[in-house]
Amino acid sequence: MVKFLKPNKAVILLQGRYAGKKAVIVKTFDDGTREKPYGHCLVAGIKKFPSKVIKKDSAKKTAKKSRVKAFVKLVNYQHLMPTRYTLDVDLKDAVVPDVLQSKDKKVTALKETKKSLEERFKTGKNRWFFTKLRF
């Protein structure tokens, strides 16, 4: 079978707290692990999408509206919907599988993810990824 869930692939989460949110695959575990004996992957996604910026907004307000909140999570393949989009953002060094073991590691990983996603948003690339799903 062809593996189409590869790193940097944009996905939509279908179940749980972040259902309907967009995420990007960081690392895949096709054969599972000892703790999770099923196919799953580590994803980093957008918890809170940036708001729409208009021309008359001040610089301060524009900066506030351009903020992104991120999340990092291990997700079962059954709870993902893959999309045709890929996101060329480098999260491999910031988000590693053992990040979820301790709180302080997770906080630093979230800050790194947030920074790289905000930078991607401000350059105007991958516009689809930063728009809220309307459903």
UniProtKB/Swiss-Prot annotation:
Family annotation (PROSITE patterns): RIBOSOMAL_L27E (PS01107)
GO cellular component: ribonucleoprotein complex; ribosome
Keyword Transcription regulation in record: no
Keyword field: Ribonucleoprotein, Ribosomal protein
InterPro entries from the UniProt entry: Ribosomal_eL27, Ribosomal_eL27_CS, Ribosomal_eL27_KOW, Ribosomal_eL27_sf, Translation_prot_SH3-like_sf
Pfam family name, one: Ribosomal_L27e
GO-annotated molecular function: structural constituent of ribosome
Listed GO biological process terms: translation
Xref: PANTHER family: 60S RIBOSOMAL PROTEIN L27
Family: Belongs to the eukaryotic ribosomal protein eL27 family.
Protein name, as recorded: Large ribosomal subunit protein eL27
